[in-house]
């Protein structure tokens, strides 16, 4: 009888642990999805320099090419 009670308590404890872990994981996953969506939106709305505008890096230009010598977008 005591062994049966111990086994039942152990099963209930392990089930509760799994449910808590699953709930925490799903919440974290949802937060991650929200951040991912925000990141995608920021990439879609980024501004870039048009040709002949000043640049220092390729990513500043809409064409993704910056002339190193004249520091202008292609």
Curated annotation (Swiss-Prot):
Disulfide bonds join 48-62, 55-66, 61-73. Its main location: secreted. It is found in: Secreted. Residues 23-46 form a propeptide. Expressed by the venom duct. Pfam families: Conotoxin. InterPro entries: Conotoxin, Conotoxin_omega-typ_CS. One of its GO terms (molecular function) is calcium channel regulator activity. The presence of a 'disulfide through disulfide knot' structurally defines this protein as a knottin. Omega-conotoxins act at presynaptic membranes, they bind and block voltage-gated calcium channels (Cav). Belongs to the conotoxin O1 superfamily. This is Omega-conotoxin-like PuIIA. It comes from Conus pulicarius. The lineage of its organism: Eukaryota, Metazoa, Spiralia, Lophotrochozoa, Mollusca.
